Amino acid sequence: MNDLKLLRSKLSTETIEELYKNLNLLKKELFNLRFQQALGELKNTSRFLLVKKSIARIKTELTKRSNSEEY
């Protein structure tokens, strides 16, 4: 639970460019995880959930920032 608070505070301090960079890295990692799963090489399937949630958190932060700029 404490790690989640640290992650959220880290996301709020990063620039938009850093957020997009991290988002692209996580999307590539998710692609690689899916590829490994298809080949039967994936050992840690729980990593899927962590990567997907991290992507969602970054997208939420980007949406929050874009909405705050509009008003």
From Swiss-Prot:
Gene3D superfamilies: 1.10.287.310
Transmembrane segments: none
Record keywords, A-Z: Ribonucleoprotein, Ribosomal protein
CDD domains in UniProt: Ribosomal_L29_HIP (cd00427)
PANTHER family reported in the protein's UniProt record: 60S RIBOSOMAL PROTEIN L35/50S RIBOSOMAL PROTEIN L29, LARGE RIBOSOMAL SUBUNIT PROTEIN UL29C
Family, as annotated: Belongs to the universal ribosomal protein uL29 family.
Protein known as: Large ribosomal subunit protein uL29
Native source species: Rickettsia massiliae (strain Mtu5)
Lineage of the species this protein comes from: Bacteria, Pseudomonadati, Pseudomonadota, Alphaproteobacteria, Rickettsiales
Gene name as annotated: rpmC
